[in-house]
């Protein structure tokens, strides 16, 4: 994706405010008009390669039921739907992103839910989901054990979860917002719920380096 003048301005402003609490909050849930638009613009091009690779790793097959936690700009939804899943639940708590998703996606297989992923009862039944995807979202889930219990509830036996994140950069962000940035500590928690494997992924440039964590329901 070729960067525009506005993209370069967004990068400049991001570097100025990168480690502030207001930037952290808007990376989690865009609110402030200026900062929120900076984060939205950065997400579109800064995660492009990571998102494409994450969707490939999710290995969606025809008639899968998918949950994406934090669908954001919808980049991953556009890629997932090409693999002909039966259903995608796109979860998003940001009002800004939620409005964009509902405006941009009209495929009947995609259900956009403005729900927190720690409680999906009444929306998603027990053991009905094949795969769950979280891209740059795991940092914000607090308390994380409540989310993991809910993922365990909705996931089919031998179903999988793919968590992808840039834990190095995330560890420098405001800790009151970015809660789960210690990779080794996170893996220890995940192992209490699922079979876990982790891989460092280098797609050729620093902005596209990330960790991919695969969880399988025991």
Predicted regions and their residues:
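A short SAM/SAH-binding and catalytic strip from SAM-dependent methyltransferases
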Residues: 131-144
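A short acidic, Gly/Pro-enriched loop at the edge of an enzyme's catalytic core
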Residues: 122-132
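Conserved SAM-binding loop and adjacent beta-strand
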Residues: 35-52
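A short glycine-rich, Lys/Arg-flanked "PGG" loop and its adjoining helix->strand segment in the class I
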Residues: 145-157
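Conserved Class I S-adenosyl-L-methionine
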Residues: 175-193
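Core SAM-dependent methyltransferase catalytic element
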Residues: 202-218
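Class I SAM-dependent methyltransferase SAM/SAH-binding core
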Residues: 67, 72-120
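Conserved beta-strand signature within the Rossmann-like core of class I S-adenosyl-L-methionine
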Residues: 158-166
């Amino acid at each position: 994706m070729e960067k525009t003048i506005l993209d370069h301005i967004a990068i400049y402003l991001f570097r100025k405010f990168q480690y502030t609490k207001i930037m952290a909050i808007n990376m989690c849930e865009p609110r402030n008009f200026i900062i929120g638009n900076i984060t939205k613009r950065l997400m579109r091009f800064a995660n492009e390669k990571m998102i494409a690779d994450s969707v490939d790793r999710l290995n969606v097959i025809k008639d899968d039921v998918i949950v994406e936690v934090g669908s954001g700009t919808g980049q991953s939804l556009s890629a997932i739907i090409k693999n002909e899943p039966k259903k995608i639940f796109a979860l998003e708590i940001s009002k800004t992103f939620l409005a964009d998703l509902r405006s941009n996606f009209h495929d009947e297989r995609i259900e956009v839910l403005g729900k927190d992923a720690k409680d999906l009862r009444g929306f998603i039944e027990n053991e009905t989901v094949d795969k769950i995807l979280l891209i740059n979202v795991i940092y914000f889930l607090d308390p994380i054990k409540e989310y993991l219990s809910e993922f365990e509830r909705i996931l089919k036996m031998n179903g999988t979860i793919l968590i992808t994140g840039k834990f190095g950069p995330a560890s420098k962000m405001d800790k009151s917002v970015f809660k789960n940035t210690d990779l080794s500590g996170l893996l220890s928690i995940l192992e209490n719920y699922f079979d876990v494997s982790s891989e460092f992924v280098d797609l050729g440039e620093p902005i596209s380096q990330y960790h991919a964590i695969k969880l399988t329901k025991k």
